Amino acid sequence: MTTVADILKYVETLAPTYMKMDWDNVGLLCGSRETPVTKVLVALDPFERVCREAAEWGAELIVTHHPMIFDPLKSVTEETTVGRSIMTLCRHGISAVNAHTNLDCAPGGVNDVLAATLGLKDVETIPPFFRDDQGRQWGLLRRGRVEEQPLSQFLETVKSSLNAEGLRYVDGGKPVRVVAVGGGHCSDELMSALDAGCDTFVTADIKYNEFWDAQALGMNLIDAGHFATENPVVAVLAEKIAAAFPGIQVKISETHRDCMKFY
């Protein structure tokens, strides 16, 4: 019999908890470790629609990238989306597990999958590196190479590969050869990408001043969207869980889509 604890332990082999940022919240955030599991729903976010989908499908567990609980909670009521999500899970005996920044950093995680989806070659982790008191070292960003091409061509690749609704970008005035990637909000690592010899950086949630900084520094900076840059890992995560636990059903959420549209 497979339990929540079994799947949690496996997820933590894929994305060790020591790789999470200090401010993050990962692991089992709702439910019971002892609950038997026959169905797992995998999604990027544990939003209300995903929780309802899990309940309707009869899942005992949802596994997501983003955490069910991130900001401190003072109450759990139906007056908030987080409260409704938690209450839906509790009513139906569904547990919630997530791997967030630990999955961003982990080998084969968010940023390795993003690099592979964009067709980058010779992919490697670049600084900044993190190290714990046991001497273990890891990093967040990835760097890879593409055949030299104009920015316009690479933009087409990014948009089509990630099924992005649209892209925001600045042209740094250079062809694309060496690309850094950071799924989700990694734009504060612009200088890290530049110092690593990258001419192009693909990330999300880029601020106004960061676009100006990139242009001044001669960096092609591409905002492909938070959902689009991180969602590719969902299919990979679901596939790995299904392979590790062949006796259970694993499904990718059919209701969770990017809510952002471009007019």
Regions found by a protein language model. Give the residues of each.
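Hydrophobic structural segments
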Residues: 1-263
